[in-house]
Amino acid sequence: MISSPLFFGQEITYPPALNIDLNYAYLQFYNNDQLKKFATHFENVDKDKLVILHYGGSHIQAENPTTIARANFHKKYGSGGRGLMFNYSAANTYSSVNYSSSKKGTWKYAKSFQARNTALPLGICGMTVETNEAFAELNFKLKNVITPENHDVFLFFENDSISYDLDIYFDSVLVNANEHQLETHPFGLSFKYKEGIQAIRLVVKPKPNAKRFRFYGLSVENEENSGVVYHSTGVGAAAFRSVLLLDKMPDQATVLKPDMVILDFGTNDILSTNKIDANLEKQIIKSINKFRAINPDIIIILTTTQDLFYKGKPVTACFAFRDLMDSIARKQNCLFWNWFDLAGGTKTIKTWNAEGYAQNDCIHLTKKGYQVKGQLLFESFENTLCLYRDQATITDYTIPGKLYTDYVPTVVIPNPTNNVVVDTTATISDSIPPKVIKVTPPKVVPKPALKKYVVKKGDTLSQIAERNRTSVSKIMKANRLRSDRISIGQVLVIPK
């Protein structure tokens, strides 16, 4: 088993069979300004709080990988607070691994994977719940107590003339204006709280002429302006277009002041069709612009999917999605995390499943699989920061995506009468339709199988080259290595 750094005394381990390629454990960047801006947030974290928003699908809603990443950031850079929470019970869905939620009364809900619901606009958490009943409740119970601190608490709800009032209990303490400096705002309300927190109870109070209480989420942060706040804001089944439906998010985000946003979508964009939709690039660029309108200096990190199977067949659009995200990151001045190749690339999800790191659907990971992903996300941040410390003036750091024998570089768009593909090198704007090219599918000539070697303890490149009757330079070229440094578990292509 390969070990990663300690996570609160527990090693995150994984077998070499997962084919994890640590050459990709970086956030790729395309100019020095973005790298410097990224690194400066961590250099100043002891006096300027770093706020990260992580959007995605079901894995982010449950907080499996983000719990590991958050814990590592807090351990190294200090905790800026717990971050966002939502009452998933009222939305009839599963909760975070870090807390349970329950409700009393009747609640209706909307989620970002659905079409826009003008009657229930969506906020920063990607879900909204609403009740028309006085004395309805939203309850939260944390598995680990939020430690006593000078907390800033923000409740996001529709605070207008027809909203019910609210009683707020932290454990058994009723929050009040005098003791807790409770203030009302257009976004909801805020207050101070110093004690530890394990249970939160929101009780809807009657008010003359009130008609409903509409809840968007709550956030618990530390008052001190230091450390990392890591908000995990996923919605199961959400695709990239879901970001464009968060109509209340911009106003609420100005309260939380995000410095970085990780846009971790893709699976629900390509899974069922095995194709890149013609509108996807436009949706991604609009999502990027939506966050830059909130904070022009925000760091945006684009990611990829992992290897996927759907109904027993490989999802080959994963390659094109990886290349599309890399291309958009270059054009839009974003950072890029190539999880697809880091996680082993094509035809590896079956192995992840066999080793107990992916579920039987070969789409979702298991708990320990997501722990590995969260750990490698944190390590990718750290490796990028180390690169900056060693080479502060480096202009870019890119690692070409791997080529595979089943790689499909073009993206077929569904069309019953024409065989067309979208040229994903072209930028799709609101006014210019996507460029299409008529094609004749080429004959696929299978490439010979590549010989691979998994690095073991004590191995050096020269020893591996000698055993396989090749040279160090050829191995470095075949694997696009920048140095002769290798790590245990790394999979090397052995050239002839």
Region spans (language model):
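Primarily a LysM-type cell-wall glycan-binding module
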Residues: 423-424, 431-473, 477, 482-496
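Bacterial Sec-dependent N-terminal signal peptides
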Residues: 1-16, 493
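Conserved SGNH/GDSL esterase-like catalytic core that processes O-acyl groups on lipids
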Residues: 61-169, 181-282, 317, 364
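Catalytic His-Asp segment of secreted/periplasmic serine-dependent ester chemistry enzymes
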Residues: 246, 308-414
